[in-house]
């Protein structure tokens, strides 16, 4: 008796319970399903894909009044700020001339100062002639242009660089200083010779002023030794 009570207390003698979904299904239907839930799912998927292949998911028909009414209520100005493809751009206008050109028509394209210039109806021969004319016109006046540029550069260098004028002034001042020092040296030498002459030759002072110029060359060497 005690052993049975313990088994029942541990819930070991009870039968396995059905799931809640099966209980509710039995209560509602009151009958058994002829196939399982997995078969039901596969059958539903098969019918869904058949319907998908036969008819499109969304079909826009102009005869459908509900879609037309919804389309009429949409304002295209509302989407221009968000969708740039709906807004009118200048690229379409700029490509009109290019689209109008025939595929066999040759064009001349010139890139100058960050701009593109297209000239239609110009063959390669005409383009070569234009290039030759431009090259010849530049070579004819190239020498004159170079001379003007060189003269202008020289003038600007002399004008902007004050070092040239300062160097010329410094050279002139140095030459003048050298001449002044040489003149002072010669003058002092002359005075020394005048003072030393009567003592060297024993001549009188009265005769000295008259014959000093005649005997200057003779006394020059002796005065040099005396200075040393």
From Swiss-Prot:
A motif (Jas) lies at residues 176-199. Induction: Induced by infection with the bacterial pathogen Pseudomonas syringae pv tomato DC3000. GO terms for biological process: regulation of defense response; regulation of jasmonic acid mediated signaling pathway; response to wounding. One of its GO terms (cellular component) is nucleus. InterPro entries: CCT_CS, TIFY/JAZ, Tify_dom. Residues 101-136 form the Tify domain. Keywords: Jasmonic acid signaling pathway, Nucleus, Repressor, Transcription, Transcription regulation. Its main location: nucleus. A motif (Nuclear localization signal) lies at residues 177-184. Coiled coil: none annotated. It comes from the Eukaryota. It is found in: Nucleus. Interacts with MYC2 (via N-terminus). JAZ7 competes with MED25 for binding to MYC2. Interacts with MTB1 (via N-terminus). Belongs to the TIFY/JAZ family. Repressor of jasmonate responses. This is Protein JAZ7. The lineage of its organism: Eukaryota, Viridiplantae, Streptophyta, Embryophyta, Tracheophyta. The gene is JAZ7.
């Amino acid at each position: 008796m005690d052993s049975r009570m313990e088994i029942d207390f541990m819930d070991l003698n009870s039968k396995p319970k059905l799931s809640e979904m099966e209980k509710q299904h039995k209560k509602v239907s009151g009958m058994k399903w002829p196939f399982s839930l997995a078969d039901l799912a596969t059958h539903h998927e098969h019918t869904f894909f058949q319907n998908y292949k036969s008819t499109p998911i969304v079909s826009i028909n102009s005869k459908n009044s509900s879609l037309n009414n919804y389309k009429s209520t949409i304002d295209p100005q509302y989407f221009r700020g968000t969708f740039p493809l709906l807004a009118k751009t200048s690229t379409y206008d700029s490509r009109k001339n290019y689209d109008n050109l025939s595929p066999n028509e040759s064009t001349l394209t010139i890139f100058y100062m960050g701009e593109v210039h297209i000239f239609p109806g110009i063959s390669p021969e005409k383009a070569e002639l234009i290039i030759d004319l431009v090259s010849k016109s530049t070579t004819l006046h190239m020498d004159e242009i170079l001379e003007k540029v060189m003269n202008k550069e020289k003038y600007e260098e002399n004008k902007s660089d004050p070092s040239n004028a300062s160097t010329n002034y410094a050279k002139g001042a140095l030459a003048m200083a050298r001449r002044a020092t040489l003149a002072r040296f010669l003058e002092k030498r002359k005075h020394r010779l005048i003072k030393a002459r009567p003592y060297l030759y024993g001549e009188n002072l009265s005769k000295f002023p008259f014959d000093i110029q005649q005997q200057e060359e003779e006394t020059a060497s002796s005065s040099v030794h005396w200075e040393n």
